[in-house]
């Protein structure tokens, strides 16, 4: 008997008694009795039980009675064969009910509904735990936040989100997890077990429920509704995170700056902004990212994959969130509203950017000239004016540009010239005028051979008293480089009189192939601006009428801007005078009429270097 006991205990079952339950020493699962714990332990390979577990085995059971009573059953169950194999994955089971229960993880079947709320579950034990939440039986409460759970294991998993503990590390890729079920699901991805494929985009998943969640991104189904604001979601986890916003719960707080977050992933991405860590490296271009979502989005840009298509207009998108935002263009839904001027927005970041207009905050300041900006991206573009950096290069001719939009406009000229065989148009650099002192006191040096002496002041939106600053080689500095075409041939005859600077007017512009088609009458236009101007002649393309004067508009934004003319709302105020305006663009135009205070330092060296001009302008 002593030899048999030693033989039975020498391998050591990978479980121990913990209170009134039996706990697996490999994955921390618990079971109500020893036979069930033993059956579960057999699912782990012998290598799963480490030497430390085997050494601790003689101390596991402190109650000899339970060990004696279950010893024979344990050894018998471990040695029992597994004749019931899953056809979809390598797992095998001893009994048919166990195989049927496992099969639900593949089929997504949830035959156990909750009589209170209708939520369904795969296993009866999960339903029992859920019913305890309806009865208010949540004895395990988190010490970090107000959440409570029906089981101790769920509480421990939740608390790891606060402590950052992730004890389950993947041996293949090093990724770690707090939840053992998520860890097991991740291991399947390395095994290549993804039997469920999306018929639309081909993306494959290890479980059917994940495929069902993914399919909602194509169909637009959002069955999880917020009872507070009516917003709907495609996943229950997204609804849970959203509800924290209403409850003002931000359980994940940054110790460095105090900022709170509703999701652990958002908190972890934020932490990298302090450390500067960018662990996600693109193998194609070497660019690095701090969060996985930006990295995946960047990879799709390389692959050109846009699997999410709008069913109304056929436009494709890389992200389901981009598709959901695009759908609001068709529905007119603008859920984000400014509390100060009642302006509404399609996206939350548009509202945040708009809020800076009212607050006047411009936290991003240029170290060279002191100019401040509301957004970091605007400061980055502005800084290129000082550094001369032009990171966007044309592959056809080698020209470089400050911003991506200018490169795209320039590339259209190559596409049109390939069709007509015409030479590229001369580009004019327009935008920000240099101070009058560069070219003389209020006088403009005319461009040689050009009859455009009176044009620049009006073209640039400058006040008449500025004298219309123009100099040789177009001594005007531009934030972007754009093609300038005369839309009205009779005004000034500027394009046709440029002479050697490039014949951009006359017959050459007429020979351009049309690119933009009117959706109503099919008439074609060479530029988007001309198309939009033409579409105003079609009443059916202006479906948004003003209820007060009957004037109609092609989009809702135009109607909202027009409606302010009937009311006294002028949300954009000038900081230098009492005037207020209906739109931010009107305010910016007005601000140019205020003279720059004498003594304001304006660095000219980077601007001169950008244009390649001599330091002293010719008078």
From Swiss-Prot:
PROSITE patterns linked to this entry: ZINC_FINGER_C2H2_1, ZINC_FINGER_C2H2_2
InterPro entries on file: Znf_C2H2_sf, Znf_C2H2_type
Modification sites for N-acetylmethionine: 1
Positions of modified residues (Phosphoserine): 10, 387
Zinc finger intervals, C2H2-type: 22-44, 84-106, 112-134, 140-162, 168-190, 196-218, 224-246, 252-274, 280-302, 308-330, 336-358, 364-386, 392-414, 516-538, 544-566, 572-594
Localization per Swiss-Prot or TrEMBL: Nucleus
Annotated SUPFAM superfamilies: beta-beta-alpha zinc fingers
Composition skew (Basic and acidic residues), residue ranges: 51-71
UniProt cross-link Glycyl lysine isopeptide (Lys-Gly) (interchain with G-Cter in SUMO2), position: 59, 65, 80, 154, 512
Role: May be involved in transcriptional regulation. May play a role in DNA repair process.
The protein's name: Zinc finger protein 668
């Amino acid at each position: 008997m002593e030899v048999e006991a030693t033989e039975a205990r020498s391998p050591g079952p990978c479980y121990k008694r913990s209170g009134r339950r039996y706990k697996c020493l490999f994955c921390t699962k618990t079971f109500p009795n020893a036979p069930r714990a033993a059956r579960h332990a057999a699912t782990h390979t012998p290598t799963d039980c480490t030497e430390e577990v085997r050494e601790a085995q003689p101390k596991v059971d402190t109650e000899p009675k339970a060990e004696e009573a279950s010893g024979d059953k344990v050894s018998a169950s471990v040695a029992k064969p597994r004749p019931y194999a899953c056809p979809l994955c390598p797992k095998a089971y001893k009994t048919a009910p166990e195989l049927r229960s496992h099969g639900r993880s593949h089929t997504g079947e949830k035959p156990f509904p909750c009589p209170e709320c209708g939520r369904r579950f795969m296993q009866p034990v999960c339903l029992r735990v859920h019913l305890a939440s309806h009865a208010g039986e949540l004895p395990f409460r988190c010490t970090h936040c107000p959440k409570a759970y029906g089981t101790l294991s769920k509480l421990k998993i939740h608390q790891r989100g606060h402590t950052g503990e992730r004890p389950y590390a993947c041996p293949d890729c090093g990724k770690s997890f707090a939840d053992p079920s998520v860890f097991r699901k991740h291991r399947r991805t390395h095994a290549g077990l993804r039997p469920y494929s999306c018929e639309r985009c081909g993306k494959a998943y290890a479980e059917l429920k994940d495929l069902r969640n993914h399919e909602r991104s194509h169909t637009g189904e959002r069955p999880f509704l917020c009872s507070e604001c009516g917003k709907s979601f495609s996943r229950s986890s997204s609804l849970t995170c959203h509800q924290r916003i209403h409850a003002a719960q931000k359980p994940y707080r940054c110790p460095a700056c105090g900022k709170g977050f509703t999701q652990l992933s958002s908190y972890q991405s934020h932490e990298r902004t302090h450390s500067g860590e960018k662990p996600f490296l693109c193998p194609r271009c070497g660019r690095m990212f701090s969060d996985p979502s930006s990295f995946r989005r960047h990879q799709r840009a390389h692959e050109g994959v846009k699997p999410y298509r709008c069913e109304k207009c056929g436009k494709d998108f890389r992200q389901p969130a981009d598709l959901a935002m695009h759908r609001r263009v068709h529905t007119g839904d603008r859920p984000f509203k400014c509390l100060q001027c009642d302006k509404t927005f399609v996206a939350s970041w548009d509202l945040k950017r708009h809020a800076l207009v009212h607050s006047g905050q411009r936290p991003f300041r240029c170290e060279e000239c002191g100019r401040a900006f509301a957004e970091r991206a605007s400061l980055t573009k502005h800084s290129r004016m000082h550094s001369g950096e032009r990171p966007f290069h044309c592959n056809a001719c080698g020209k470089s540009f400050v911003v991506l939009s200018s490169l795209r406009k320039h590339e259209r000229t190559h596409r049109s010239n390939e069709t007509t065989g015409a030479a590229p148009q001369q580009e004019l650099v327009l935008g920000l005028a240099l101070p009058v002192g560069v070219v003389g006191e209020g006088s403009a040096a005319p461009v040689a051979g050009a009859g455009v002496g009176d044009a620049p002041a009006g073209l640039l939106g400058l006040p008449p008293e500025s004298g219309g600053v123009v100099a040789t080689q177009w001594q005007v500095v531009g934030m972007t480089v754009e093609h300038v075409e005369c839309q009205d041939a009779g005004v000034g005859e500027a394009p046709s009189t440029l002479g050697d600077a490039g014949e951009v007017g006359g017959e050459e512009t007429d020979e351009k192939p049309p690119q933009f088609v009117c959706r109503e009458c099919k008439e074609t236009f060479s530029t988007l601006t001309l198309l939009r101007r033409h579409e105003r002649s079609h009443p059916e393309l202006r479906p948004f009428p003003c209820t007060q004067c009957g004037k109609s508009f092609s989009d809702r934004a135009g109607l909202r801007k027009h409606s302010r003319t009937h009311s006294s709302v002028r949300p954009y105020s000038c900081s230098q005078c009492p005037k207020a305006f209906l739109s931010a663009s009107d305010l910016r135009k007005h601000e140019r009429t205020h003279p720059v205070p004498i003594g304001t330092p304006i660095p000219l060296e980077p601007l001169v270097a950008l244009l390649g001009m001599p330091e002293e302008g010719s008078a």
